[in-house]
Amino acid sequence: MSNSIDPDNLPAEAKVKFSCFGQAVGKMRNELKVDMVSPMKETFHLATDEGSFHGGDATAPPPLALFIASLTGCIMTQIRAFSKRMKIEIEDLKIDSRITWNWKKLDNIYETAPESFEIDVFIESSEPLDRVKDLILAAKKGCFIEQTLGQKNTINHKLKSGENWIDV
């Protein structure tokens, strides 16, 4: 799955690009092929499914479970990677994350909106507190998911209609 790249040989700046192709199968299951396009090439195969609420079979985690897992895993990865680069020894790391969304019923559908994102960090380290705090601050800035969630984003949707793509 992963190829070996020396971070010291990467350019000072780069675009990190991913793409994902999803195929609906079964009742509510989605099979996903995720490609890291640059600066390196990697491919991952994932799936999502829903439980009975949406009429699925719960054969894979629902998208929201993967969402919070991705956020938690991203900050944990950055803390561990940056601790090595910043020469900060950590003996143990645990993260407890919570996300709350608001859900509002509209006839037979619903709308959602994020309410809160909370990440509690437990680090065992003999390093001074200020160095551990600096590590967490650096990891926050290096976590692609946290940086994405921390700003307003525009998500463009297009629908294929015949030979054309229509903005939705």
Regions found by a protein language model. Give the residues of each.
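Short, well-ordered amphipathic alpha-helical segments that serve as non-catalytic structural scaffolds
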Residues: T77-Q78
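Extended beta-strand/beta-hairpin segments
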Residues: M1-A69, A81-V168
